[in-house]
Amino acid sequence: MVVNDLLDYWLNKGWTKETTICSIHDPLCSCVLKSKVAVIDFDAVKMGYEKLHKIASPASVDALRYDEKELTFIEVKGWKKFLDFTSKVTEEKIDKKRKDYEYKKKLDDSLNICLQTIREQNLISEDEFCRFPKRYIVVIDVQVKKEPLASLAVSLQMLATSSTSWDTMCWQKTQSDVDQIPQEDYSGLNMKHPHLVSCSDFDACFSSP
């Protein structure tokens, strides 16, 4: 399979290992619905890469998932802890927190680590990697009801200050951030448009059709 040599290189270097998004996000996770999908810890790959090249730490996604169909870049963000431990949650505080997340930069730097490793180690052809199907999934630990809301602006006006409402706001704003990642920036990389899922729905993204 196309990307196997790349993953094997990182594993053989001892830079990373197989894990789950729950272990990456919160090693002491007490959720009942823990993810069972095996992923590669990409933050660990980034650390190995920066030590090898003696560079300032790049951004990176949290994990990779690879099968014969596609390579998935995965970024995990936890809103629940922010909501639970922030005094007097406001929309302004949520917006300030969002600025730290840099979803596009994490994807861009991760792709660069992959491409640079392929070039330096001559593992597979760069063209093969670029043509192989890819996608970017942002995973968060809040979710909203399945009923669609009319629009972000309208839905935010409807919010009260209950925890469910703040969950909804975090979901809607994260969805907006993910939707704004420009697809045209990844032309030639066979990258699907990024999408957002809740952690409870993550495993379903990899179930057989």
Model feature map: region roles:
Residues 1-58, 199-209:
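Basic, amphipathic N-terminal segments that precede the first structured/catalytic domain
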Residues 51-54, 61-62, 122-127:
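Catalytic micro-motifs at enzyme active sites that drive phosphoryl/nucleotidyl and oxygen chemistry
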